[in-house]
Amino acid sequence: MTGPAIGIDLGTTYSCVAVYKDNNVEIIPNDQGNRTTPSYVAFTDTERLIGDAAKNQEARNPENTIFDAKRLIGRKFDDRTVQEDMKHWPFKVTNGPNGKPNIEVTFQGEKKTFHAEEISSMVLTKMKEIAEAFLGKSVKDVVITVPAYFNDSQRQATKDAGTIAGLNVMRIINEPTAAAIAYGLDKKGGGEKNVLIFDLGGGTFDVSILTIEDGIFEVKATAGDTHLGGEDFDNLLVEHCVRDFMRLNNGKNISSNKRALRRLRTHCERAKRVLSSSTQATIELDSLYEGIDYNTTISRARFEELCNEKFRSTLVPVEKALESSGLDKRSIHEVVLVGGSTRIPKIQTLIKNFFNGKEPCRSINPDEAVAYGAAVQAAILSGNQSEKIQELLLLDVAPLSLGLETAGGVMTVLIKRNTTIPTKKNQIFTTNEDRQEGVLIQVFEGERAMTKDNNLLGKFHLTGIAPAPRGVPQIEVTFDIDANGILNVTAMDKSTGKSEHVTITNDKGRLSQEEIDRMVEEAEKYKEEDEKRRKCVESKHKLENYCYSMKNTLSEDQVKQKLGADEVDNALNTITEALKWVETNQLAEHDEFEDKLKHVEGVCNPLVTKLYQSGGAPGAGPDMGAGFPGGAPPPSSSSGPTVEEVD
């Protein structure tokens, strides 16, 4: 049976999943009881780990523990931000086909290469499984959130990640818009409100200004930085500690030691969190590098000084969004803080001062608000009839201007940024030369006057134009943005009716359909491997459990007296051999563990039966859960307490 549609906030550092049921949004906890799950995937010699399990082992396996996939998705390898991030990542990123970044790991002793979409799809699969365990049903339909300032390539790549995870992505929605739903869902009446959502997460930053009235959420403007968040504050703290360690230890530089750096980063992140509630935090690391301990205390003031420039840079998109919306700061009724990094006191102070002392709204959980809104949108799109969400309407905008290159490399804009989507715009263009039989349509996004300064999304040729003097042919170009913010472009020669159509594809390092299909198959294969591994671990545990339980039972003196020392010693030797075998065969197959268990049971069960029949079971017998070890029969002895019939 298929369950309801879910909402997933696919974050840079943590992800969150929610569902709308019984007229309420439920944030779904994972198997550790946590309401957010680390966006981490780790590859070991034996298995693939996702979420908490992956993050918990990163210090001892830094090269094969992948995080920050969201900072790679939809980007090129030579992108400045990718090159900058690579300095901080312990895992290896290489230049792949079409300039697309590849992540290289060692998995089960073999070199493997993954795209960011595949890593993100693994995190999405984990979130899907968390929802399925909670709902007791399989889940297919999903709404996934992305930063409002994500460009076309990043949105499409996120949608591809959902497809690889076996999900039907009903809609990609913007994170601040989703958070606005969480804020405004229960606030009916009270007239029109201008709300500014300030969303500073682990890796991305968005500002959106919305007008909310009677369930209609209309985005007026959006701005942001897809490369600013808590990770950057961690990096600054790590760099400070590296310099401090050098100063204290005659210039010893730990930068090249990935394990030391990863341990330091974990403690820096922890210190950053502590500084949100305390004025100082201690970092203590035993034997950090070459046997040298590292201990330091960071004050909140020092941390704020280190990150001052980054903190202040968050106000630039706020000003930009206000300007684009045509509103001034006095017209904003409510400032809503979203994302874990808004817990930093300095960020809260900066915003409060910017808005002339207005207290930001803290009524929603900054970690969960985005998933909450995504779950509401998922319920609406899947036809949920709940009265509470019936009247809700989302009107979002395109974050960047879209246009094409005309003569001289000029950017001719068809859709201006902050235009409400979905939208469709067309314009007539013509040829630049006499008897020109084809035109190259190059599609760009960005705000600069010349295309060379903007972002090329894709290009295609329209051929077969009837030969004519320059300026005579009429070529109609149509830009169509769907509700996901993804662009389709059509060009048509009006005299011949010949047209070419493109959903912006591979020019920006997009995955082809063949690649997506291959990745879907591989994801299925990894899922099967994970299941196989789980069964192996279970059967290994069952064997060990049985062996230790029997060892305890048979080692008691009274048992040897009852059963005879030879038989008991033989059984104990069999158990010892089995446990030694487990030690040296940790990666054995499920069937091998099962066979070994049957062998040990074959030796021990007759003894257990004999023991119970003689009425001499010590204590309560081996603790094997329900029933007896290996199905040994229950005691049939006449000794012990008797049962009387009740009249």
UniProtKB/Swiss-Prot annotation:
The keyword ATP-binding applies. InterPro entries: ATPase_NBD (IPR043129), Heat_shock_70_CS (IPR018181), HSP70_C_sf (IPR029048), HSP70_peptide-bd_sf (IPR029047), Hsp_70_fam (IPR013126). Keywords: ATP-binding, Nucleotide-binding, Stress response. Pfam families: HSP70 (PF00012). The keyword ATP-binding applies. Residues 616-630 have a biased composition (Gly residues). Coiled coil: none annotated. Belongs to the heat shock protein 70 family. Residues 615-647 are annotated as: Disordered. It comes from Theileria parva. This is Heat shock 70 kDa protein. It comes from the Eukaryota. GO terms for molecular function: ATP binding; ATP-dependent protein folding chaperone.
